[in-house]
Amino acid sequence: MKEPSIDVKHIATLTGHSGCVYAMDTGFSEQTIFTGGSDRYIALWNLETLQAEKFSAALPAAIYTICHIPEKNILLAGTTTGAIHILDLDKKEEIKILQHHRGPVFDIQYSLKTNCFYTAGGDGNFAVCSLDTLSLLIMKKLSYDKARSIAFNDVTSEIAVALGDSNVLIFDLFTLENKNDFIAHQVGEKVVGANIVRYSPDGKFLLTGGRDAHLNIWSVENYELIKSIPAHNWAIYDIAFNPDATLFATASRDKTVKIWDAKTYQVLKRITKLNFEAHTHSVNKLIWSTYRNYLVSVGDDKMVMIREVNRK
């Protein structure tokens, strides 16, 4: 059976950040995205005009993660100091700062099912906060290493959290009962950090990326390893599915983005400096937009890169 092929077209490279770009989330509409990074600024970009929008927020520390919650019209930004800045997008002002982490905030995600947002920190803590009061509800110490990434399975109502000690913990979304935990990445006998967790949109698989440069596929039914792929040359930092869930992309410290078939887990395209306009440094974050199937990547080279991906 012939492997499906895809076309990747470079649309634009957007410049404006003066430091590494670590954070990205969807914007006010499908054609806008927020970005943030070491220059301490949050920018808003338009994927249609390929220009920066008239929006800018300056924070007192480098930004590792941003989370746009359109239902509340707020933007959350986690920084290297452990602060979570909450911006009211209607009022265009900061309305609150949460400081429950004692290390950098690596990830912020939210769930309308629980009306909460969730944060993962370099202090090994995982926190649950109310979307109504914007205050801390629960704090769990998960590791003496970092808590790096959070993912929701909407089908099974589970939360996965990736830890720097290589463990991935699975919690019940509503009760936070620990349902499973396993070592996700190791090289021989040595365990290495898990950087990113991402559920497949159908809820059947959990994908993890680690410091070992491997992409691991786990069955959600029992969290047993189905496949381990030496996907990159350096650590994997992000995984993003395309809108129809037939493809996914991985981003790595090795400066590349790779596009994979979501059924066969075969690599379909390698985006490197050899064959594309590509990042010159670590690629940190991906968004696969519903707008024209654009795959957006950001990295340590300060660039926001936009590519259109279509099946041939």
Question: What spans do the regions from the language model cover?
Answer:
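WD40/WD-repeat beta-propeller blade N-cap
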Residues: 14-21, 56-63, 99-105, 140-147, ...
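Blade-level signature of beta-propeller repeat domains, shared across WD40, Kelch, NHL, RCC1
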Residues: 282-312
